[in-house]
């Protein structure tokens, strides 16, 4: 339960102070190689790879490859990740008949931008996500050397 509480704690105050000079890094689009951040700094990938719809596009089937690649890159550059979690997945939103919304991040983002319909499914996703990158030695990403300690929900 502590892990869930940590996730739900939001670092909204960082939004206004994050810039390239800040130790908290900057909001970056991870597809742009030069915007992945400098060595030895904080990075805040935005929207980043921590999108529920991308990781669990089908209920119960988790795709970690893109997130793992980002974490490995950050480890190689001694970066501290402040991960932004996006709590939307199409299959969950369809279950409660949410209306579609236009995403500011294009097609790689979900079609729906409402709160999760099933909090149990969302809790399961959050638990698996944090457990994979928490560095406690149980269910961790293979090769994890620098755990993610700071999480932001939707920024």
Kindly label every feature range from the protein language model:
Residues 16-20:
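Sec/Tat signal peptide C-region and signal peptidase I cleavage site
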């Amino acid at each position: 339960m502590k892990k869930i509480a940590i996730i739900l704690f939001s670092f909204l105050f960082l939004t206004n102070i994050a810039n390239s000079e800040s130790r908290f890094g900057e909001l970056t689009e991870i597809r742009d190689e030069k915007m992945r951040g400098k060595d030895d700094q904080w990075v805040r990938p935005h929207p980043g790879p921590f999108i529920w719809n991308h990781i669990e596009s089908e209920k119960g089937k988790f795709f970690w490859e893109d997130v793992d690649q980002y974490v490995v890159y950050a480890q190689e550059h001694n970066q501290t990740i402040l991960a932004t979690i996006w709590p939307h997945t199409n299959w969950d939103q369809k279950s409660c008949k949410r209306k579609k919304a236009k995403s500011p991040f294009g097609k790689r983002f979900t079609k729906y931008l409402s709160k999760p319909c099933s909090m149990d499914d969302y809790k399961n996703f959050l638990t698996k996500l944090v457990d994979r990158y928490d560095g406690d030695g149980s269910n961790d990403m293979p090769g994890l050397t620098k755990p993610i300690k700071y999480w932001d929900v939707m920024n």
